[in-house]
């Protein structure tokens, strides 16, 4: 990389990586376990193979799964997700619940984007945002409905463009 680019971005990148390390350490201390990272999985849906490579899947102390996607910039907004245009986390949840990732079992109950962008609240780099909400507040999909919603959207797309 150009020396100027390196000088401008390296401190930001290092701060963001330190943030990820601190967040991960805190979660591990609270009983979470990383159960899957950066490996491809596959799930057949209506005869079509859905493949995906989640950035990370954690198992919470209660046995549920947390689907994590790292973002170098801004994460998709709730309107994009609710509108069906950003379903990655829900589809990875569907795949995890369907056995696409060997040894990963459980219900996907938490969906997070870990953004390396500047956090407006702390002015530091790194923040966790969820595109869903437990109660469906602020126009978001209810957390417990996200996997089912993503599955319905996938099936509708398959029927419209591939199978129909």
Protein language model features and the residues they cover:
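Structural signature of nuclease core domains in nucleic-acid processing machines
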Residues: 1-164
């Amino acid at each position: 990389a150009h020396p100027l680019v390196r000088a401008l971005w390296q401190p930001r990148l290092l701060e963001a990586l330190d943030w990820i390390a601190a967040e991960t350490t805190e979660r591990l201390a609270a009983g979470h376990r990383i159960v899957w990272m950066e490996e491809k999985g596959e799930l057949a849906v209506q005869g079509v193979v859905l493949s995906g490579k989640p950035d990370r899947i954690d198992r919470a102390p209660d046995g549920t799964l947390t689907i994590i996607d790292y973002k170098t910039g801004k994460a998709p907004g709730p309107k994009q997700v609710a509108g069906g245009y950003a379903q990655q986390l829900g589809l990875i949840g569907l795949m995890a619940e369907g056995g696409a990732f060997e040894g990963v079992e459980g219900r996907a109950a938490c969906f997070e984007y870990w953004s390396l962008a500047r956090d407006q609240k702390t002015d530091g780099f790194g923040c966790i945002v969820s595109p869903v909400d437990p109660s469906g507040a602020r126009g978001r999909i209810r957390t417990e409905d996200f996997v089912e919603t993503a599955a319905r959207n996938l099936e509708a797309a398959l029927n419209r463009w591939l199978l129909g």
